[in-house]
Amino acid sequence: MAGLMKLGCLVFVFVIAAGPITAKAALSCGEVNSNLKPCTGYLTNGGITSPGPQCCNGVRKLNGMVLTTLDRRQACRCIKNAARNVGPGLNADRAAGIPRRCGIKIPYSTQIRFNTKCNTYIC
């Protein structure tokens, strides 16, 4: 569980980007999960030693999809649920390093943790 609590430093830091507020989030958990699924092997301490191009492309695509506050909050909820499903095999250190390893520039380092209140903390 401690490894999962480190989710904040995870991959998913990059989904928090500035954007205008709209009335309804257009982002679904299916979209979030499908974009991050290629990262699973890397994040679960398998034999994969780098995120790989499919993982990096998925992260870039997701980063470009979270345009509104509601989208970012929805992505936060989806990411927290997905990380719970991965379970204790999740490597938080690898997750935290994905933006750097993929060459993705993050404007700031908002962290998503299991105790993050996605509806109020993520703007």
From Swiss-Prot:
InterPro entries with a match to the protein in the record: Bifun_inhib/LTP/seed_sf (IPR036312), Bifunc_inhib/LTP/seed_store (IPR016140), Plant_nsLTP (IPR000528)
S-S bridge residues: 29-78, 39-55, 56-102, 76-118
Keyword Disulfide bond listed: yes
Family that this chain belongs to: Belongs to the plant LTP family.
Organism annotation: Arabidopsis thaliana (Mouse-ear cress)
Record-given protein name: Non-specific lipid-transfer protein 7
Single GO biological process annotation from the record: lipid transport
Keywords: Disulfide bond, Lipid-binding, Signal, Transport
Function: Plant non-specific lipid-transfer proteins transfer phospholipids as well as galactolipids across membranes. May play a role in wax or cutin deposition in the cell walls of expanding epidermal cells and certain secretory tissues.
Domain of life: Eukaryota
Molecular function via GO: lipid binding
Signal peptide stretch: 1-25
Gene3D superfamilies xref list: Plant lipid-transfer and hydrophobic proteins (1.10.110.10)
